[in-house]
């Protein structure tokens, strides 16, 4: 008997040693489950690699680690992401964006009427649900789920190209405020793209996982997510690996594009006062928007940034420079507000015609000026923060960890406003643009059985949870 036990023990040790050696020296298995962040403005896909425990956010064929959440319909094809951006100026009525705002959501007639005016494409009311009307070879209607499926198909193809194998399973993130219908509609979009969703995870929980908080000894976690067009603030309670969303608040009309818009309006006034005209050509407006976006990005790292844009002057619209009439003409001012979400993308110059001339508009923008133009908007970030603390019955000193998500949280003044409010630095150890997709990829690795084993995030449903919006 003793001999048999010795043999059995030796066999077990041999198997364990073989497993260890296999993990150390055999090729690592390819991830089989992808993690997807289907964002309002940008979306991305990542994988968790067994063995190393590292997350890779997968780039597209041009090296972009996220793609614009934009889909264009033409007579010949459907274009997604950056290809869609290239068509946004010439084909705005058939270029759909912000589909995530509408997916699975039921609107009142008044709510939908307020939304319709914000977009250059046709938004239709189908019994309280949204459909988009687009014209290619014929006029058709497409659902937000279909638009989402085209984005998800692109992300799926990016993952397959990177991994060198078909991908069928995914974990996807959604806003914590999404109800069951919105979550099911997101799953439907994934199914249309050929993906089986193993799990839906809340975006704040995913961000907390990216920061490693599912393994950390913290209880009250505040997630501030400020992207291109929306602000979401979530209060999480974490115990062990379980997360409960205690309170949510936000502003669906506040984000990086609004900060760009303030600088753009300032530049319009400068151009009008200097040259006596306001840019009116779409391609030049978009080039100016592109320059504004680059200035904003540069100002996150530097105290000042240069802006240079070539503009066409139509002499019949020109007034005397430095005239006392410094107010922008209202008909021209509106062009600066059009197609808000398409900011940052431009086209080529038109040829000069008779009665036209070109000027090179150059200026230097300081970080102080940018902050001054947007200070009231920056302060608005604190309103939903105060609201979630109120709903959570907490003092700001009771928050264990403040984590930042979304590209707009890179702005130094925004970080300073948050730091001054809480009296401590927010956690900035993770790239805010990639926090959600990183967390989703970790959860995808867990659901795919990858090793080294991670602590899974268990979300406790909160049926009484409602988001307070300050729009």
UniProtKB/Swiss-Prot annotation:
The record lists the membrane-crossing segments as none
- InterPro entries tied to this protein: ATPase_NBD (IPR043129), Heat_shock_70_CS (IPR018181), Hsp_70_fam (IPR013126), HSPA13 (IPR042048)
Record's GO cellular component terms: cytoplasm; cytosol; endoplasmic reticulum; extracellular exosome; intracellular membrane-bounded organelle; nucleus; plasma membrane
State which tissues express it. Answer: Constitutively expressed in all tissues.
Q: Which organism is it from?
A: Homo sapiens (Human)
| Family under the similarity heading | Belongs to the heat shock protein 70 family.
Q: Which residues does the annotated region (Disordered) include? A: 315-352
Presence of keyword Cell membrane: no
| Compositional bias segments (type: Basic and acidic residues) | 315-341
Q: Name one GO biological process term.
A: chaperone cofactor-dependent protein refolding
Give the function comment from the record.
Answer: Has peptide-independent ATPase activity.
Q: Which UniProt keywords apply?
A: ATP-binding, Endoplasmic reticulum, Microsome, Nucleotide-binding, Signal
UniProt subunit comment = Binds UBQLN2.
Segment forming the signal sequence: 1-22
Specify the protein name.
Heat shock 70 kDa protein 13
Coarse class of the protein's main subcellular location: other
- List the molecular function annotations (GO) for this entry: ATP binding; ATP hydrolysis activity; ATP-dependent protein folding chaperone; heat shock protein binding; protein folding chaperone
Question: Where does this one sit in the cell?
Answer: Microsome; Endoplasmic reticulum
């Amino acid at each position: 008997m003793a001999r048999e036990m010795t043999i059995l023990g030796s066999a077990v040790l041999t198997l364990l040693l073989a497993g260890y050696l296999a993990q150390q020296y055999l090729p690592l298995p390819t991830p089989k489950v992808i993690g997807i962040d289907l964002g309002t403005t940008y979306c991305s896909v990542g994988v968790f690699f067994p063995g190393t425990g590292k997350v890779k956010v997968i780039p597209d064929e041009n090296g972009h680690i996220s793609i614009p959440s934009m889909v264009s319909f033409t007579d010949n094809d459907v274009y997604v992401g950056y290809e869609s951006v290239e068509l946004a100026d010439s084909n705005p009525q058939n270029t759909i964006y912000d589909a995530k705002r509408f997916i699975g959501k039921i609107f009142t007639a008044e709510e939908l009427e307020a939304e319709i005016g914000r977009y250059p494409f046709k938004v239709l009311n189908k019994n309280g649900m949204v459909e988009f009307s687009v014209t290619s070879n014929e006029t058709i209607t497409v659902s937000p789920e279909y638009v989402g499926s085209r984005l998800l198909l692109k992300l799926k193809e990016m993952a397959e190209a990177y991994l060198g194998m078909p991908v069928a399973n995914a974990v996807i993130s959604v806003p914590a405020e999404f109800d069951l219908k919105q979550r099911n509609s997101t799953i439907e979009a994934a199914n249309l793209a050929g993906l089986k969703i193993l799990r839906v995870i809340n975006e704040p929980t995913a961000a907390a996982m990216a920061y490693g908080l599912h393994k950390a000894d913290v209880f009250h976690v505040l997630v501030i997510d400020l992207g291109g067009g929306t602000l979401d603030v979530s209060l999480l309670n974490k115990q062990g690996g379980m997360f409960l969303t205690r309170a949510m608040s936000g502003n669906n009309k506040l984000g990086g594009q609004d900060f760009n818009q303030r600088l753009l309006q300032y530049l319009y006034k400068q151009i009008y006062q200097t040259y006596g005209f306001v840019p009116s050509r779409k391609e030049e407006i978009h080039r100016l928007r592109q320059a504004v976006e680059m200035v904003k990005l540069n100002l996150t790292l530097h105290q000042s940034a240069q802006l240079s844009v070539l503009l066409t002057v139509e002499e019949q619209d020109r007034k005397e420079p430095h005239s006392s009439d410094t107010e922008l003409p209202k008909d021209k001012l509106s062009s600066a507000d059009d197609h808000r979400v398409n900011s940052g993308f431009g086209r080529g110059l038109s040829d000069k015609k008779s009665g036209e001339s070109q000027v090179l508009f150059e200026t230097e923008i300081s970080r102080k000026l940018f902050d001054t133009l947007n200070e009231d908007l920056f302060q608005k970030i604190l309103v939903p923060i105060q609201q979630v603390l109120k709903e959570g019955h907490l003092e700001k000193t009771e928050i264990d960890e403040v984590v930042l998500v979304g590209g707009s949280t890179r702005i130094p003044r925004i970080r300073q406003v948050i730091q001054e409010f809480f009296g401590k630095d927010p956690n900035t150890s993770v790239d805010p643009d990639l926090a959600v997709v990183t967390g989703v990829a970790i959860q995808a690795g867990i659901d795919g059985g990858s090793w080294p084993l991670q602590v899974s995030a268990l979300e406790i449903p909160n049926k009484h949870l409602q988001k307070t919006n300050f729009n």
